[in-house]
């Protein structure tokens, strides 16, 4: 009952597979979309335990996170895997929330910008320009190089580096930050509400 109306921002809650039906029921009368935390790129086959894009769509999911740092770190996900998942999501009309970014070691090496550009190019490889409009959380400069200024302006870029109530307003005021991919702060309802309120002020 404490969730404010998201007048100027879109709210998407991405939950584990088993919680998707309950989340859709819980948010059905609110302006909150439900997303998944991952998908598998094959449409069908003997892939025990995997969940395809078609399965997510059948559940009523609108969004899916692809390429999260934890997937890359713990499950060995590569840029090629991310690209396959992007194609699978777009093929069935899901909005992919594509995560790109560097590790602490890579940041200290000074290769952040180069790495992000490479990850973004890899994620979008082979994606037609008309489909790129559906994609969230890419790097505007790289998209502009790939598809032109019109598509670059339509892309939503979200900050995923631990946005919280204390830094949300400052981060969201940055010209190239359109939103946040909220992690730990979203687990505390009051903190999540504070971030939404900050977004509504922008």
Locate predicted features.
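Active-site loop-to-helix "anion-binding N-cap" substructures in soluble metabolic enzymes
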Residues: 1-202
């Amino acid at each position: 009952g404490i969730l404010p109306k998201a007048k100027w921002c879109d709210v998407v809650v991405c939950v584990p597979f088993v919680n998707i039906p309950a989340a859709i029921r819980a948010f059905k009368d609110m302006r909150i979309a439900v997303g998944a935390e991952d998908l598998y790129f094959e449409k069908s086959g003997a892939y025990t335990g995997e969940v395809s894009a078609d399965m997510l769509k059948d559940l009523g999911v609108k969004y899916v996170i692809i390429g999260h740092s934890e997937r890359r770190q713990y499950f060995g996900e590569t840029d090629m895997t991310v690209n396959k998942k992007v194609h699978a999501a777009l093929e069935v009309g899901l909005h992919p929330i594509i995560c790109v970014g560097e590790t602490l070691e890579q940041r200290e090496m000074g290769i952040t910008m180069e790495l992000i550009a490479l990850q973004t190019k890899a994620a979008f490889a082979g994606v037609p320009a008309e489909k790129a409009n559906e994609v969230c959380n890419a790097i505007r400069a790289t998209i502009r190089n790939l598809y032109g200024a019109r598509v670059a302006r339509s892309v939503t870029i979200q900050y995923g580096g631990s946005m919280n109530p204390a830094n949300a307003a400052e981060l969201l005021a940055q010209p190239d930050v359109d939103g946040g991919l909220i992690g730990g702060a979203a687990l505390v309802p009051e903190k999540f509400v504070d971030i939404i309120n900050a977004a509504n002020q922008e």
